[in-house]
Amino acid sequence: MLPPMTYDSRPETFAHSQRVGELMIQLIKEALDRSTCHDRSKTEPPEVEVFNEFTPRLKELTYGSSEYKEALQGMGAGLAHHYANNRHHPEHFDYGLNGMTLVDLIEMLADWKAATERHSTGDLYKSLLINQERFKMSGQLLDILVNTAKGYGWL
């Protein structure tokens, strides 16, 4: 039996819980929307021609190697268009990773994981380390991405 109360915190706690759920649904909806249209810009000009030419080559190269970087440079305007139209890429933002939202980061991490699955030498942890240097990623953000990948069985 509970002692008599002058204040019952439960209604406020339930209201708070409900509000947190509503706010989380905003983020979840955005993530779901992105999951159904990820990289669609690659299926139309000016990107499709560039990705048709370079994707088979990129699959054969080691991610982060000088040859890989050279191939990216060769993608020119098609890749620039892709970055400009897809906010899950740090290159989309003037301030790189620091311009991104949590939903951008979630899509980016999923993209990096899926990309490693397209390469015979793909390794998400190695890719994260390469991208830490490439994008000047903080140790804290690297830890968060590694923890997330481990939590979902990606590492």
Which residues make up each language-model segment?
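Metal-dependent phosphohydrolase cores
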Residues: 1-155
